[in-house]
A protein has these predicted regions:
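Internal active-site segments that recognize and position negatively charged phosphoryl groups
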Residues: 133-161
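Active-site glycine-rich loop that binds ribose-phosphate moieties when present
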Residues: 2, 122-141, 167-169
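A glycine-rich beta-to-alpha transition motif near the start of alpha/beta enzyme domains, typified by
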Residues: 1-112, 152-271
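Active-site-proximal beta-strand elements of phosphoester/diester hydrolases
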Residues: 117-119, 140-145, 256
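Membrane helix-loop-helix hairpins that form the core translocation module of multi-pass transporters
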Residues: 99-100, 114-123
Length: 271
């Protein structure tokens, strides 16, 4: 039995545990499955394992609640940046991920919330229709890469349903379809106006989530590329609204949103 120190934080309801990489001792998958369980663990959408390297750099490994490893999480990265701001007073930090380095800068603190601007890389957007088993007709959407894979679908209905299915049901089918070799995150986007979108997220390895930093960026990038919206907009998910700025298709996208430290403690882990 091991005693694992953790911090829990959330960004617009998308919650993560932050654990020192050394504590994982090669047990990342099992630890994520156990500690992220909502009823028998601490409960979280994933774990950010923070590796403090000898050269002073910081690197994050993200494991989803199902134990699978992902390239990065925009919200998870922001949660780590908020923890480093609170615990070490860091106002700007570069965090390495398998999806590239993400630089996070503290903008302000509003009560318990840390508002952080994150440089999210240069999105790549490709319009692509797909055919999925069990779904009638082709699905029109866009493949977007923001350091991890996304498929974005534009919808008209207020409940975000499409092709006769709820967004949750359709998202589950698309996320694991063999067309996507490593699976994909799925977003359902409604354009509300030239400066505003709303969206829902089916996250690879987690299922429906209240928010996603990379999902916010992917949804915004697709809207900016394929719909008539501004290069600066508000993107509203179930858990809250984030601000996205993307000057042009060759520039780095900037994402601004809140993160809040929930608690810290020690967990018993047998694995």
């Amino acid at each position: 039995m091991s005693r694992i120190e953790f911090v829990k934080a959330h960004a617009c309801g998308n919650d993560f545990l932050v654990i020192d990489e050394a504590a994982a001792a090669g047990r990342h998958e099992a630890m994520a499955e156990k500690l992220c369980a909502r009823h028998t663990g601490i409960g979280a959408d994933g774990i950010e394992f923070l590796d403090r390297r000898p050269d002073g750099s910081l690197f994050l490994r993200l494991f989803n609640a199902d134990g699978s490893e992902a390239e990065l999480s925009g919200n998870g990265t922001r949660c780590v940046a908020a923890w480093l701001a609170e615990s070490e007073g860091l106002k700007e930090v570069a965090l390495g991920t398998h999806g590239g380095v993400r630089t996070c800068r503290l903008m302000e603190r509003k009560g318990a919330e840390w508002w952080i601007e994150s440089a999210m890389g240069v999105p790549r957007v490709m319009s692509r229709s797909i055919v999925i088993a069990g779904v009638d007709g082709a699905i029109e959407g866009a493949m977007v890469n923001v350091g991890n894979p996304h498929y974005v679908i534009f919808v008209e209905r207020e409940d975000f349903s499409s092709h006769g299915m709820s967004w949750q049901e359709l998202g589950a089918k698309i996320s694991i379809d063999p067309l996507f070799k490593f699976g994909t995150n799925v977003e359902f986007v409604r354009v509300l106006g030239p400066h505003e979108i709303a969206f829902r997220i089916y996250e690879r390895g987690c299922g429906p989530t209240t928010s996603s930093g990379t999902g916010t960026c992917a949804s915004s990038a697709a809207a900016m590329t394929l719909r008539e919206v501004a290069r600066e907009l508000s993107a509203a998910a179930q858990g809250g609204t984030q601000r996205v700025v993307w000057p042009d298709s060759t520039s780095e996208m900037m994402l601004t949103g809140p993160a809040e430290i929930v608690c810290q403690g020690t967990a018993e882990f047998a694995g």
